[in-house]
């Protein structure tokens, strides 16, 4: 595996391999006072973010540093991009400096794929990890979500060679599916592993061509809540809208927000997830966000281990015994 750009490019075996690797890193670090492994000593990792980020950027930086890599953070606002430098020239500059990996977030769908073609033609050059490209993909978010589901719901504890543990799992994703890269990566990953995915959103917030996706579509949140093993709430991405997608925030919250009543209607063992950032009082009730069956902070924690697994796999081909 050279790059991680699009979940759809990877098999169930590769996906489960990354998830298993994340579990191994979590176990290796558990109980350590000093969270430091020599796994990527001497490797140079650049983060290149053209959009704001808290969880993704900080967890990638933490992942690299916990494996002893040299992590260098770049922001478009403080780099030569501000002077008009193109993505291609920025990428080639980092490759020439000696980058082993470039972790990039970019507002344009497909930007990560373009970057990989420029900096690693014919597979020679730094690995590119897509930390979010427009409304297209966010592969490590889908991986950490799947790891969290597996932990909380004890999926695949006795997994056979032929199974994934996700077969028949019912995942309901609610909210702004139109602008969400998270929903696309999760649909690709979960359908590959055999889960059943339902999207719940107003018609104006569903992606074009969603009828060709391996999902069910519903506009009735109340009807779907009791059936779900996982309810994943999505933020309304107002920064990508010009208005007119729904009448008001109050009406949206009434129809598509996870209220106390809807949370009470969930299965006893069902869990609540959110990729963040959460807007309490909009897509999720203030109190519900802190319920015991809400896995948001566990998702964040798993993000570090998933990103460790990703860097480890791409930069060592999984052959370094440094864990």
Curated annotation (Swiss-Prot):
Binding positions for L-aspartate? 83, 181, 235
State whether keyword Transferase applies: yes
Q: What does this protein do?
A: Catalyzes the condensation of carbamoyl phosphate and aspartate to form carbamoyl aspartate and inorganic phosphate, the committed step in the de novo pyrimidine nucleotide biosynthesis pathway.
Q: Which domain of life is it from?
A: Bacteria
Quaternary arrangement and interactors, per the entry?
Heterododecamer (2C3:3R2) of six catalytic PyrB chains organized as two trimers (C3), and six regulatory PyrI chains organized as three dimers (R2).
Q: What is its EC number?
A: 2.1.3.2
What UniProt keywords apply to this chain's record, in alphabetical order? Pyrimidine biosynthesis, Transferase
- What chemistry does it catalyse, as a reaction equation? carbamoyl phosphate + L-aspartate = N-carbamoyl-L-aspartate + phosphate + H(+)
The pathway entry for this protein reads as: Pyrimidine metabolism; UMP biosynthesis via de novo pathway; (S)-dihydroorotate from bicarbonate: step 2/3
| Protein name (record) | Aspartate carbamoyltransferase catalytic subunit
Instruction: Name one process (GO BP) from the record.
Output: amino acid metabolic process
- State the similarity comment: Belongs to the aspartate/ornithine carbamoyltransferase superfamily. ATCase family.
Enumerate the GO terms in the molecular function aspect.
Answer: amino acid binding; aspartate carbamoyltransferase activity
Q: Which InterPro entries match?
A: Asp/Orn_carbamoyltranf_P-bd (IPR006132), Asp/Orn_carbamoylTrfase (IPR006130), Asp/Orn_carbamoylTrfase_sf (IPR036901), Asp_carbamoyltransf (IPR002082), Asp_carbamoyltransf_Asp/Orn-bd (IPR006131)
Q: Which residues bind carbamoyl phosphate?
A: 55-56, 105, 138, 141, 276-277
Q: What class of enzyme is it?
A: transferase
